[in-house]
Amino acid sequence: MSTAPGVIKLLGEHAVVYGKLSIAAAITLYAHAYSTKRGSDFAIKLKDFGKEVKLTSEELDNIYASYNKKKSFEEYAKLGYGVALPYATIASIMARNSSLDGLEIEISSDIPVQKGYASSAACSLAFALELAKQIGANIDSKILEVAREGDKVIHKSEGAGKIDINTSFYGGIVSYSSEMGARKENIDVHLNIFIVDTGPKKSTAETVGHVRELYEKDRQGTERILNEIDACSRKGIELLKTGDKRGFGEIMYRNQELLNMLGVSSEGLELVVKKAKENNLLGAKLSGGGGGGIAIVLADDDAETKVFSDLGFEVKKVSIDYEGAK
C-alpha cells in the first residue's frame, strides 16, 4: 500500500504563477493506493467513483503515444477512459520499461475533492508510488515527474502539480518558486489548523484566468500586489521557524486581504475571515485557487472554531503531516 497526504496552501497562491514564493503544508488527510495480482491485464480501480478500467499492453502503448503527440489536453481527453485517464497516463509512462500485466491498483481517498486540498495530486502520487514499488522502480525525483503528468491531465494544464506533488511527497512545510524549485523547510511547529468548507468553488483555471486578465489590464498595480504576497511568504517562513504563531496568523490575514484585492475570494470566505478576526483567532485565509472552497484557520483552542459550525459551515481539524508520502 502507498499513501500520500493532501496539501493546503499556507501563503502565496496565485502569486506563485508569476514567479513569487508560495508556502504549502502536507496535512493529515490521505489518498491510498493498493495493489493486487489478478488476471492477465493491467487494471485501475477507482473505488470512490465505482469505476474499473482494464488495459492491455497494446492499449498502454497507444495511450503513451497519444499523450506524447497531443496538441492540447482537451484533445487528449477525447481518447476516453474518463476519470481513469490520468492514472492510465501514469501507467503508460511506467510501462515503458516494465510489464504491468496482471497487476491491479485500487485508488481511494479521504481527501475532499474540488475543495482546495490538492486531492488530485495526492491520488496521482499514491498511484505512481504503488506502481513503482510493484515494478521495482526507484523512488526518486523521476517518480514525482511521472505523478505530475497525471495531475496535468486532471487540470488540463502544463503547470499543474509543481508545489502540490512535491509537498505531498516530502511532507511538512514546503516552499516553492519557479526560480528556486521546491524546498522542504526545516520547520517543526505544531499548528492547530481548522479547515472551514464554505461550499462550492470556482475552478482553479477560472480564478487563475481572472488574475491573468487583471494583470494584463493593470500590470503595475497587480505586480505590486503580487510582490506584497511574495513578501508575506518570505516573512511567514521566518515567523514559523521562530514559532511565532500569532505573527504568522497576522501574515495570513494580510495575505487574504491581498488575495481579495486580486478578486479570488468569495462571500463565504470573507465571512470566515471576518468572524475569525472578531473572535481574535490567530489567522485565517483561503487556501488554493479560491472563489469559494476552503478557508484555513489557525486557533489556540478547538472551542474557538464553534463560531464557524454555528454558521452552518463544515469544520475539520487537521495537523501537518511531516512524514510525507510512503
Segments and roles (model prediction):
Residues 1-9, 15-16, 24, 32-88, ...:
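C-terminal nucleotide
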